[in-house]
Amino acid sequence: MESSVPLGNSVRTGAACGRIMAVPSKAAQGDARARWKLLGQALRKERLDDSLQKVSVRRFNSFRLFSVVEMKEIKREADCQTWFQYTCVFCPQYSLCLRHNSGISNVADILTSFDNTGNVCVWPSEEVMAYYCLKHKDIFRGLAVCELGGGMTCLAGLMVAISADVKEVLLTDGNEKAIKNVSDIIRRPQNEEMFKDRLVSSRVLRWDNETDVSQLEGHFDIVICADCLFLDQYRACLVDAIKRLLKPSGKAMVFAPPRGNTLSQFCNLAEAAGFSIQRHENYDEHISNFHSKLKEKEAAVYDENLHYPFLLVLCKTR
């Protein structure tokens, strides 16, 4: 009898993969039980046990590159969404009003919507990419820019939109709820003033949807993307989407942690698709220094394999 393991919308079997499924170690079984308990507490909206935080990817949630202040003058949304003022600590002239979850997500949405990871929080890689784009805003001057998989805030793409003398910024995600939220953020009066005469828009874009990709083929000078490499079933689609969205002379900037071998697998697929890749581990002095301090002083919560994003720069070679 074949063993089967569900992965998103697909099922992988031991025979189909050409390998015997290994029996999980006791440590792995213990982590799995802890994750189920963590999920149960989250669904019951209980305070999470400190002992369970070690199995949560979100136990580390920020490189502290942005100050985040709740905008209490704006009425809290009924679905646990709250407006916050995001201001870059190192470039305080750049600030935006963002809305995202401040409580437990709706369970029905989690179970029925397409890839809800971007609706959970602003992930560290997105935060780092937003900061990096602000520090290097001149590279976007006069260009058409697209953010892929930006979640419910598209923080990095929005920071490009308010800081760079950019021609166009398109903010995308595969989740409809995420893009509805991004659209509301764009239309927020305080934010609209920051965009000036720049073209800033949002739309649902699934990398595996031919119509979504073909409508924008060859349109962008730069594609940016953060922490979108971990889903096995969409990794090849992401590579294909990036290649097709870019102009012949275009490039992509991808920020992502290793997460086992997922980063390497993405690089292999990208090279096979005709990209040259520059891989940077130390691309910003402040982030590198903070990374070193985290490894030394916060090892209980900080795992560089899960949390420290590398920078990949992809350029077309064919």
From Swiss-Prot:
Quaternary structure?
A: Monomer.
Protein name in the entry = Calmodulin-lysine N-methyltransferase
UniProt GO molecular function: calmodulin-lysine N-methyltransferase activity
Q: What keywords tag this UniProt record? A: Cytoplasm, Methyltransferase, Nucleus, S-adenosyl-L-methionine, Transferase
Q: Which GO terms describe its cellular component?
A: cytoplasm; nucleus
Q: What is its EC number?
A: 2.1.1.60
Species assigned in the record? Xenopus laevis
Per the record, the GO terms for biological process are:
methylation
Q: Which reaction does it catalyse?
A: [calmodulin]-L-lysine + S-adenosyl-L-methionine = [calmodulin]-N(6)-methyl-L-lysine + S-adenosyl-L-homocysteine + H(+)
Q: What does this protein do?
A: Catalyzes the trimethylation of 'Lys-116' in calmodulin.
The cross-references to Gene3D superfamilies, in alphabetical order and at most eight, read:
Vaccinia Virus protein VP39
EC class name: transferase
